[in-house]
């Protein structure tokens, strides 16, 4: 008699994806982030569902409904802070996951990589709309500033902005539609994650050496299930420390003031995980130029497979490229810091230099260094 997990139509799919999946024997903890992102997504959907049961998407009551969740709902404070800080953890893991893909050359799986970049855009859009929902000062002004960027699109821009707003300013209609989109997008993300996995399982996982590992595979369960559970425990520990000891560490104090269209906060800025892109946007004095740079700062990820000039897939044996990648990471940290600073000297200049170096490293220096390393191989 055949084992049910190998014969049942649905269990068979789960078996081929998470149990009997042939996996390279040498993948490191950097490969944990995929499963951790899946857990984060599930956590966000569950906490979000419970928040939606008590939240009201109306400009007059949105702020007080969030206060009500924190004060009156059983463990409402825990659900709300798990959702808010869960988003931060989600983005940390997302950036680690992308960084690992760049370091080990996983972007050579074109379909998996491209759907991953589209996923990143969708997650960013979802997080932005979620930030608007508490209807605090930073929610309102963040929504106003970011949606206004679309007015830079020639000819149709201003009409498009009013269409998204549902009026002549960010108001009740905007909040209602943002709530609707924020609710539905995570389910679309879940479907896209399944496509992401489908493409990945067509080729199999990459590994730290960047070499073909068909001759050395082990079953996913129990080896990597136990490894993923260890990563999960670390994640839950970090998340609970954040929620229980400093839940507002990554938030903005301005968002504890109800939205007021007549009073602009001194420094309008998005959540910390968007600051690097925000710094690139602000570093260009032209509106359309800034918007294009903002879009391209993420879209540039799609060029990685094209810009790969090295004869080796992974950076494991390429010290020059390794150094360059860590310079890029430092550059992104500088951009994140600049994004949270006021628009004044010397921050403007630092932001412009960091933005130029961000694009130069990826578009010019990385391919050049790869080409040099190819020459060095012949020595």
UniProtKB/Swiss-Prot annotation:
**Record's GO cellular component terms:** mitochondrial inner membrane; respiratory chain complex III
State where the protein is found: Mitochondrion inner membrane
Q: What are the transmembrane regions?
A: 33-53, 77-98, 113-133, 178-198, 226-246, 288-308, 320-340, 347-367
In the record, biological process GO terms are:
mitochondrial electron transport, ubiquinol to cytochrome c
Q: Enumerate the residues binding heme b b562.
A: 83, 182
List, in alphabetical order, the Gene Ontology terms for molecular function in this entry.
Answer: metal ion binding; ubiquinol-cytochrome-c reductase activity
Q: What are the names of the required cofactors?
A: heme b
Residues binding heme b b566 are: 97, 196
**What are the alphabetically sorted keywords of the record?**
Electron transport, Heme, Iron, Membrane, Metal-binding, Mitochondrion, Mitochondrion inner membrane, Respiratory chain, Transmembrane, Transmembrane helix, Transport, Ubiquinone
Give the way it sits in the membrane.
Multi-pass membrane protein
Q: Record's superkingdom?
A: Eukaryota
Note describing how the cofactor binds? Binds 2 heme b groups non-covalently.
- Please tell me where this protein is predominantly located: mitochondrion
Question: What's the subunit arrangement here?
Answer: The cytochrome bc1 complex contains 11 subunits: 3 respiratory subunits (MT-CYB, CYC1 and UQCRFS1), 2 core proteins (UQCRC1 and UQCRC2) and 6 low-molecular weight proteins (UQCRH/QCR6, UQCRB/QCR7, UQCRQ/QCR8, UQCR10/QCR9, UQCR11/QCR10 and a cleavage product of UQCRFS1). This cytochrome bc1 complex then forms a dimer.
Record's family? Belongs to the cytochrome b family.
User: Any idea what job this protein has?
Assistant: Component of the ubiquinol-cytochrome c reductase complex (complex III or cytochrome b-c1 complex) that is part of the mitochondrial respiratory chain. The b-c1 complex mediates electron transfer from ubiquinol to cytochrome c. Contributes to the generation of a proton gradient across the mitochondrial membrane that is then used for ATP synthesis.
The UniProt record's further free-text remark is: Heme 1 (or BL or b562) is low-potential and absorbs at about 562 nm, and heme 2 (or BH or b566) is high-potential and absorbs at about 566 nm.
This chain belongs to the protein called Cytochrome b
Source organism per UniProt: Echimys chrysurus (White-faced spiny tree rat)
Give the lineage: Eukaryota, Metazoa, Chordata, Craniata, Vertebrata
């Amino acid at each position: 008699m055949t084992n049910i997990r190998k014969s049942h139509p649905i269990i068979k799919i789960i078996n081929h994806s998470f149990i009997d999946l042939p996996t390279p024997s040498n993948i490191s903890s950097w490969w944990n982030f995929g499963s951790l992102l899946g857990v984060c997504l599930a956590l966000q959907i569950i906490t979000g569902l419970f928040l939606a049961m008590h939240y009201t998407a109306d400009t007059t009551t949105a702020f007080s409904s969030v206060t009500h969740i924190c004060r009156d709902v059983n463990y409402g404070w825990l659900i709300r802070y798990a959702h808010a800080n869960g988003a931060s953890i989600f983005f940390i893991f997302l950036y680690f996951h992308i960084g690992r893909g760049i370091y080990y050359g996983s972007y050579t799986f074109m379909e998996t990589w491209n759907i991953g970049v589209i996923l990143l855009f969708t997650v960013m859009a979802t997080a932005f709309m979620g930030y608007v929902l508490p209807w605090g000062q930073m929610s309102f002004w963040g929504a106003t500033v970011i949606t206004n960027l679309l007015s830079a699109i020639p000819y149709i821009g201003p009409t498009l902005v009013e269409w998204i707003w549902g009026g002549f300013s960010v108001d009740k209609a905007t909040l209602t539609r943002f709530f609707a989109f924020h609710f539905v997008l995570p389910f679309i993300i879940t479907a896209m994650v399944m496509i992401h996995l489908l493409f990945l399982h067509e080729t199999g996982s990459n590994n730290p050496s960047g070499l073909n590992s068909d001759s050395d595979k082990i079953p996913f369960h129990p080896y990597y299930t136990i490894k993923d559970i260890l990563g999960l425990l670390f994640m839950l520990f970090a998340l609970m420390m954040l929620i229980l000891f400093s839940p507002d560490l990554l938030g903005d104090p301005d968002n504890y003031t109800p939205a007021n269209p007549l009073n602009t906060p001194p420094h309008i800025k998005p959540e910390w995980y968007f600051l690097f892109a925000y710094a690139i946007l602000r570093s260009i004095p032209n509106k359309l130029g800034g918007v294009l740079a903002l879009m391209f700062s993420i879209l540039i990820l799609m060029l990685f497979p094209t810009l790969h000039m090295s004869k080796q897939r992974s950076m494991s044996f390429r010290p020059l490229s390794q150094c360059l990648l860590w310079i890029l990471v430092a550059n992104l940290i500088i951009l994140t810091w600049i994004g949270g600073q006021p628009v004044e000297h010397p921050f403007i200049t630092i932001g412009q230099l960091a933005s130029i170096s961000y694009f130069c490293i990826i578009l010019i220096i990385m391919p050049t260094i790869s080409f040099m390393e190819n020459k060095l191989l012949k020595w």
